[in-house]
């Protein structure tokens, strides 16, 4: 990937965004990564040294979509159907196969204090067809699947992320579901009651991708929910943004960061992540592979002192990213082509 061109695009956006009174994302000029010794053999994946990147082989998993940590093991939804427990050795075990959950999206693991559901796996899934109404399914420890919550007033939607609110925050004790087709986020309590948390159609309707909660040390967004979004129907390249939403469900006028194509996952690195500990990493899907002749324009950037620096490139359609232990875990449902995805792992070599 030519990051010098990317720098130019972000710089132009910076001027434009400054005039609009929003925080633009500026990408720093760094050496290209294409000659990195950390390139994944034969995969097109590349990451800054001294990190390594690889596509994990997990037989049985077709198109990884969303991921969640379950005590060091990955819980992964598959666009081809089903939800799996996946080890870092690549062993995939069906928690619920595609006959039980046909169209899964976001996944979440019940924390202590969420009713009697600690350890249960929750899945945001489309009922019926892929464009069907989003519901929250629960997989109990025996593998039984039941409908936990139905989203109110949810017409045909596009199911996306599902996250529990951060502990010791205004969002604690609730489950949050993203339905992009409705431009809405829903909140669900331990009884399964769901209500609209916020709908985001102004100044334009937004495609919603993912949500997360910043650490308390983040002075800009402490106590907020961060939401990845992109204006629907927009032809401009770099209008994707990370918005700040308060506990009242209202989106702040000031954005957290802007300058992406489609921000699809973001997380703060742990102290064990080599020389880049405690930094914000952001996955940008770019254009979908089906829209740009399978161009590998998916990237990971890291934010250091308000500068976004290129970190990894060569991904196809990254749709989610989490840190599990000391590793960055990225779902890419088209990493090897349409319907041929992979879990991409980035690790420090230090």
Provide a role label for each language-model segment.
Residues 1-16:
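N-terminal secretory signal peptides that target proteins for export/translocation
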Residues 17-32:
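Bacterial N-terminal signal peptides
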Residues 59-72, 100-120, 133, 153-174, ...:
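Beta-rich, blade/repeat-based domains predominating
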Residues 78-79, 125-128, 179-181, 216, ...:
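Short loop/turn segments immediately following the C-termini of beta-strands
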Residues 82-85, 133-137, 183-187, 238-243, ...:
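A short loop-to-beta-strand structural motif that recurs across blades of beta-propeller domains
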Residues 86-91, 139-144, 188-193, 245-250, ...:
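Short loop/turn segments that connect beta-strands within beta-propeller blades
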